[in-house]
Design a protein with these regions (language model features):
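Catalytic center-proximal scaffold of phosphoryl-transfer enzymes
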Residues: 1-207
Length: 207
């Protein structure tokens, strides 16, 4: 998986791809069903592994990770402007407006800082898969924040123990923290419409 601030195209992929495939096959053997949507951080190995398992499942690239990657391609003096344009695009109110601002973003940043535009194009339509979902789900579907917050909270709770004797111990500790309420989870935004499948992709081609 991508480290924070690391460029997606700089990641080692093949060993990680095999590790992810092996882990996924274990979960499938335990009853994991084909997902309706894959939400990933942008790691090339992760994306390749999941695509080999579920080639027809829509994939959403985390918009927070992509924002960090855009900033890594821009001089610090432009960070505020990149962020403003990116947020205007990602948090637009309709699918059509998201796509309109995507085109404007690329036109502007191809001229102003080519690396920023190239980084956005690297993700392609996978950065905008959330627009195929009911709008009530957009907040949760845009990022991997929910999973990462849970992970960070778990690490914070066990930081004094540093090393656990086994994976089973880690799982037991996690569920005990969850059951006791020390770690809490909330329903994802738009949970009422989760049964609705993603719409077909009808995104305008970006000039």
């Amino acid at each position: 998986m991508a480290r924070e601030g690391q460029c997606e195209d700089a990641l080692p992929t093949m060993p990680l791809t095999h590790e992810i495939q092996d882990t996924a096959m274990i979960l499938i053997a335990r009853g994991l069903r084909t997902p309706d949507l894959l939400l990933i951080d942008g790691g090339a190995g992760l994306e390749r592994a999941l695509a080999s398992l579920w080639p027809n499942v829509p994939t959403q690239r985390c918009t927070v990770h992509k924002h960090r990657n855009l900033l890594a391609h821009a001089p610090e003096a432009l960070h505020e402007e990149v962020t403003a344009d990116y947020n205007d695009m990602i948090y637009a109110e309709t699918s059509a407006e998201v796509m309109r601002r995507r085109r404007l973003f690329l036109v502007k940043w191809r001229l102003k800082c080519r690396g920023v535009a190239d980084s956005l194009e690297e993700a392609g339509d996978r950065l905008f898969t959330f627009t195929r979902l009911p709008q009530s789900q957009w907040r949760s579907a845009r990022t991997t924040n929910a999973v990462e917050r849970l992970h960070e909270e778990f690490k914070r709770r066990i930081k004094t123990q540093t090393v656990l004797p086994s994976a089973e111990t880690a799982a037991m500790l996690f569920w005990s923290l969850l059951a006791s309420g020390q770690i809490s989870m909330r329903k994802v935004d738009g949970w009422q419409t989760l049964a609705e499948p993603p719409a077909s992709m009808h995104l305008d081609l970006v000039a």
